[in-house]
């Protein structure tokens, strides 16, 4: 069962019922709580653009609990975060892995956070190929370029040398919230708002 909770709010005109995500959106909170796919990306991008149109000066809060997912869908979110004027604060609640971790570290500098029991994981992009040898070679080149680009981005956002990032992302590299802070993925581990 996938029930979405509702909240009831008193207004001048009477009671108003919201699904919880719409209510959080009023407070400029966007949640990624699943694998990142095209549908999730479209929803998150729409929310970011809406919040920018509402107020381009106020920060947006992106809460992340995601195992990652599609790189193209992830880049749609990441590019929109960079495109819009408001700072996007990021917060890992639970797990931010793969592209979830990339979104986490791409928040506004000084505004990237993790809750104390969060876990963060970085690794190289995953992919597969089938078909003729030429098609496999083209796909392999694309994945290797993507790997280089992602490692470069992690290095730039964290301040780590690219050689260390390349080494760490060869396999799944898990970190606690405090380890992610030391690595430069988040700026602080928070226990209170």
UniProtKB/Swiss-Prot annotation:
Q: Which UniProt keywords apply?
A: Cytoplasm, Hydrolase, Protease, Serine protease
Q: Cross-referenced Pfam families, in alphabetical order?
A: CLP_protease
One cellular component term from this protein's GO annotations in UniProt: endopeptidase Clp complex
The record's catalysed reaction(s) read: Hydrolysis of proteins to small peptides in the presence of ATP and magnesium. alpha-casein is the usual test substrate. In the absence of ATP, only oligopeptides shorter than five residues are hydrolyzed (such as succinyl-Leu-Tyr-|-NHMec, and Leu-Tyr-Leu-|-Tyr-Trp, in which cleavage of the -Tyr-|-Leu- and -Tyr-|-Trp bonds also occurs)
* Biological process annotations from GO: protein quality control for misfolded or incompletely synthesized proteins
Q: Which Gene3D superfamilies match?
A: 2-enoyl-CoA Hydratase, Chain A, domain 1 (3.90.226.10)
Q: Which GO terms describe its molecular function?
A: ATP-dependent peptidase activity; ATPase binding; serine-type endopeptidase activity
| Main location group | cytoplasm
| Domain of life, per lineage | Bacteria
Catalytic center residues = 98, 123
Q: Which residues form a coiled coil?
A: none
EC number in record: 3.4.21.92
Asked if the keyword Hydrolase belongs to this entry, the reply reads: yes
- State the compartments where it is located: Cytoplasm
Q: What does this protein do?
A: Cleaves peptides in various proteins in a process that requires ATP hydrolysis. Has a chymotrypsin-like activity. Plays a major role in the degradation of misfolded proteins.
Family the UniProt entry places it in: Belongs to the peptidase S14 family.
Q: State whether it acts alone or in a complex, and with which partners, per the record.
A: Fourteen ClpP subunits assemble into 2 heptameric rings which stack back to back to give a disk-like structure with a central cavity, resembling the structure of eukaryotic proteasomes.
The name this protein goes by in its record: ATP-dependent Clp protease proteolytic subunit 1
Q: Which organism is it from?
A: Bacillus anthracis
């Amino acid at each position: 069962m996938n029930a979405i909770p509702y909240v009831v709010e008193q207004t001048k005109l009477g009671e108003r019922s919201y699904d919880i995500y719409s209510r959080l959106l009023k407070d400029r909170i966007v949640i990624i709580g699943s694998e990142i796919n095209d549908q999730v990306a479209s929803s998150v991008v729409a929310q970011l653009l809406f919040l920018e149109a509402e107020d381009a000066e106020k920060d947006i809060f992106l809460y992340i609990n995601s195992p990652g997912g599609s790189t193209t869908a992830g880049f749609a979110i990441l590019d929109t975060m960079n495109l819009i004027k408001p700072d996007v604060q990021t917060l890992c609640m639970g797990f931010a892995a793969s592209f979830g971790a990339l979104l986490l570290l791409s928040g506004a500098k000084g505004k990237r956070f993790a809750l104390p029991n969060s876990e963060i994981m970085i690794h190289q992009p995953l992919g597969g190929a089938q078909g003729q040898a030429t098609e496999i070679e083209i796909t392999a080149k694309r994945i290797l370029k993507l790997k280089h680009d992602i490692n470069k981005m992690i290095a730039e956002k964290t301040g780590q040398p690219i050689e260390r990032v390349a080494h760490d992302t060869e396999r799944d590299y898990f970190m606690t919230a405090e380890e992610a802070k030391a690595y430069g993925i988040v700026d602080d581990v928070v226990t209170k708002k």
